[in-house]
UniProtKB/Swiss-Prot annotation:
Its EC number is 3.1.26.4. InterPro entries: RNase_HII (IPR022898), RNase_HII/HIII (IPR001352), RNase_HII/HIII_dom (IPR024567), RNaseH-like_sf (IPR012337), RNaseH_sf (IPR036397). One of its GO terms (molecular function) is manganese ion binding. It comes from Aliivibrio fischeri (strain MJ11). This is Ribonuclease HII. It catalyses: Endonucleolytic cleavage to 5'-phosphomonoester.
């Protein structure tokens, strides 16, 4: 089976031949100083297309929120995986991302024939896999996974903001912004902060 996803800037993606069920996998949250790295795996239904899939970062919040339930409803299977802040500190962010991706794929209620991973590294998997640079723009399954992962993590940051409103998590989503740095300097770190990340280590005096 050969499918193509067209992009104005990138070459069309040629799906590997000889496979039927493709899972797209993407992550959100490698860069933030707080919270989990969240991954999603999605197997789309070719007979039930979803309009408007692209890299989640290129969509408005409103559009992501509209696509989120549509993907959940129309996909053949979808699953979330995650590594919490303490796991990131133990493993490092790259390895934690790989583990979270493994968890997302393992959670699918349909086993894919092939995993398409956004980026340039494939975790150890029980099926064939391929890393796709800019995959969230080139591969519909990865686009869908990026939307599921981002909406999920953004909602978690909004919940964390309710518990710790002084940090502004709903606005910066835990990323290393000036406002976040200032909040850490003033209020210290919380249990969800990643202690292995340099800005957090600096505040803790363990650099």
């Amino acid at each position: 089976m050969t499918k193509k996803t067209e992009s104005k800037e990138l070459p069309p993606f040629e799906y590997p031949e000889g496979y039927q069920l493709f899972a797209g996998v993407d992550e959100v949250g490698r860069g933030p100083l707080v919270g989990a790295v969240v991954t999603a795996a999605v197997i789309l239904d070719p007979n039930n297309p979803i309009e408007g899939l692209t890299d989640s970062k290129k969509l408005t919040d409103k559009k992501r929120e509209l696509l989120f339930p549509e993907i959940q409803e129309k996909a053949l299977a979808w699953s979330l995986g995650r590594c919490e802040a303490h796991e990131i500190d133990e493993l490092n962010i790259l390895q934690a991302t790989m583990v979270a991706m493994q968890r997302a794929i393992a959670g699918l209620n349909i086993t894919p024939d092939f995993a398409l991973i956004d980026g340039n590294k494939v975790p150890e998997l029980p099926m064939a896999g391929l890393a796709v640079v800019k995959g969230d723009l080139r591969v519909q399954e990865i686009s869908a996974a990026s939307i599921i992962a981002k909406v999920t993590r953004d909602r978690e940051m909004e919940e964390l903001d309710k518990a710790y409103p002084q940090y502004g998590f709903a606005k910066h989503k835990g990323y290393p912004t000036k406002a976040h740095f200032e909040a850490i300097e003033e209020h210290g770190v919380i249990s969800e902060h990643r202690r292995s990340f340099k800005p957090v280590k600096r505040v803790l005096g363990i650099e």
